[in-house]
């Protein structure tokens, strides 16, 4: 399951464009859709990314894999998996708040996003200041 760079870029643009069109229609009150329906392109894109990531992580379980090459690679892929799950949690909490399924405080909705941003800043700082190849 390997995608070329052009395919990934095209897929990203397609799902982003579809999501933004649906979002504009919802915000202009032209479409009376549920917020969960608005986020379907985002979730389809995230599902594709999660499947690709899990396949790459499962490739490490092959019998011919040499663990000396890329031991830090599994940590990076685990961070990507955690980041995707945090993004999914934020999207679900945001949709639940916008649909008024819950009376959760808005600051609680943003906790997964804040954790994701803090982790991204930590990884960026680590890659800038501590990784020297």
Swiss-Prot record:
Keyword Transmembrane helix: yes
Major subcellular site: membrane
Residues that span the membrane, as ranges: 5-25, 35-55, 78-98, 110-130
Coiled-coil annotated residue ranges, if any: none
Location of this chain's protein in the cell: Membrane
Domain of life: Eukaryota
Membrane topology designation: Multi-pass membrane protein
GO cellular component terms, A-Z: membrane
UniProt keywords, alphabetically: Membrane, Transmembrane, Transmembrane helix
Protein name: Transmembrane protein 60
Organism of derivation: Mus musculus (Mouse)
Gene: Tmem60
